[in-house]
Amino acid sequence: MQKIFLGRSIAERIDPDYERHGTTGIIASRNVATGEIVHPLIQPTRKEEDYLAHIDGVVSLHATHRHVFINDNLNNVFMKTLNTHKSESLVRFIAGIEGIDQSTLGVKDKSGILKNMKSRAEFLSDKSHQIVFVYTPKHCSWLNQIECWFSIITRRLLNKRSSFISLEELVMKISDFIHYYNQFLKKPFKWNYKGNLLRV
C-alpha cells in the first residue's frame, strides 16, 4: 500500500489499491534462555527440505546440547497445511543423530516409524533423544514462544501500514529487524500467569 501524505494538519491516508510484489516465508527458532532468534530462514518456500535445513542449522550451532523444538498440532501458523514438522526426512535426520539404523525405520505410509504422521510424531517426541519435538494441543500456539515472536514482528514490521517496494526490500527489512532484535531487544519472555481460574 502506498502512504499518501497530504500536508500539515491533514490526516495520513492509505490508498486501498496496492501492487503486490510477492511473498516470502520465515522459518525460525527462539532460544528461550536468551530470547535470541536462531538460524532464521527467510525464503519463498516452506517445504520439508527447508524445515530440515533450519533444524540442521540450529542443531549444528550447538551440536552437543539437547534441543527441544515446540510445534503446534497444526504445524505452524505459516505451515498449517504442510507436514514438514513430522516428515520422513526429519525422522531420518533425527535417527542419524541418535545412531539409529535407518533400515529399522520402516517404509513411509506402509510400516514402522515412518508408517504415518502419528507414528513419526511419537518418534520425534521421544524424550530420550537429544533432539525432541513437542507438539502442543490445538489452540495452544500461545505456548509456542516463536509464535509469540511472530506476533512481535507482525506488530512492529509487517503490519497493515507497512509498505515495501519489492520482495528484496521485504526480505532485507525482515533480516534487518531480526538482527536488530537479537542485538538490542532479545530477552527471555517472563510468563506471569499464576494458574488461577478466570472469573466472569
Residue ranges, per PLM feature:
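Short functional hotspots at interaction and active-site rims
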Residues: 1-200
